[in-house]
């Protein structure tokens, strides 16, 4: 079978303005809860797209660790490629794809670091191996497997079961200025609703052509 022959009909839901929440944060929470209830694998997995100072885009899967009306929070190494991208250009985009529900959510906005206290709280909730890994990994830098495991042993010997949060590791919050909710429909006539600020502490909702 050719790649061009692969196709699927989308028939699992609809998205209409009359049923959409007035707030995109409420609409996201509704869909996220439905993804969890449907046992979508890792419903908190999202694609994070960033752009560096030269305009070169890059994308990777990360896990959301919190969301509310202030934004969407994730944690990473500040010296990683995405961290360096965000230092140069704080504009970014998130994409959630819940394939079993034939839904995706795209969120655009500006990213800022969370407080040290918020980063500390989450870091100390992680399994020990993950905390030591944050020290061992010079994320995005070349390394051999033997070197990586030697660094993990080094920091395990140094900190035991109580490693502090590395200064190069912490959280970011994306503060949204645009949402798009996509629901697959038959004949590729998909539902797309875009939310943008209305300038009055609310949001406008527009239907986009599929």
Curated annotation (Swiss-Prot):
InterPro entries attached to this UniProt entry: Pyridox_Oxase, Pyridox_Oxase_CS, Pyridox_Oxase_N, Pyridoxamine_oxidase_dimer_C, Split_barrel_FMN-bd
- How far does the signal peptide extend, from start to end residue? none
Residues bound to substrate are: 7-10, 65, 122, 126, 130, 188-190
Q: In which pathway does it act?
A: Cofactor metabolism; pyridoxal 5'-phosphate salvage; pyridoxal 5'-phosphate from pyridoxamine 5'-phosphate: step 1/1; Cofactor metabolism; pyridoxal 5'-phosphate salvage; pyridoxal 5'-phosphate from pyridoxine 5'-phosphate: step 1/1
Its Gene Ontology biological processes?
A: pyridoxine biosynthetic process
Record EC number: 1.4.3.5
Concerning its family, UniProt says: Belongs to the pyridoxamine 5'-phosphate oxidase family.
User: What is the official name of this protein in its record?
Assistant: Pyridoxine/pyridoxamine 5'-phosphate oxidase
- Source organism per entry reads Bordetella pertussis (strain Tohama I / ATCC BAA-589 / NCTC 13251)
């Amino acid at each position: 079978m050719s790649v061009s022959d692969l196709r699927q009909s989308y028939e699992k839901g609809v998205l209409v303005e009359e049923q959409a929440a007035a707030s995109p944060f409420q609409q996201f929470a509704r869909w996220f809860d439905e993804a969890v209830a449907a046992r979508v694998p890792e419903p908190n997995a999202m694609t994070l797209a960033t752009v560096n100072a030269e305009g070169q885009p890059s994308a990777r899967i990360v896990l959301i660790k919190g969301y509310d009306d202030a934004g969407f929070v994730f944690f990473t190494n500040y010296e990683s490629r995405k961290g360096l991208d965000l230092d140069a250009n704080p504009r970014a985009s998130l994409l959630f794809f819940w394939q079993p529900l034939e839904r995706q959510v795209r969120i655009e906005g500006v990213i800022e670091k969370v407080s040290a206290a918020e980063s500390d709280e989450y870091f100390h909730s992680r399994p020990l191996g993950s905390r030591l890994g944050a020290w061992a990994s010079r994320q995005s830098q070349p390394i051999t497997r033997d070197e990586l495991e030697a660094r993990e042993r080094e920091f395990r010997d140094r900190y035991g079961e109580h490693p502090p949060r590395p200064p190069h590791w912490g959280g970011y919050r994306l503060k949204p200025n645009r949402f798009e909710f996509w629901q697959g429909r038959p004949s590729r006539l998909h539902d797309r609703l875009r939310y943008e600020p209305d300038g009055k502490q609310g949001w406008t909702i527009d239907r986009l052509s599929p």
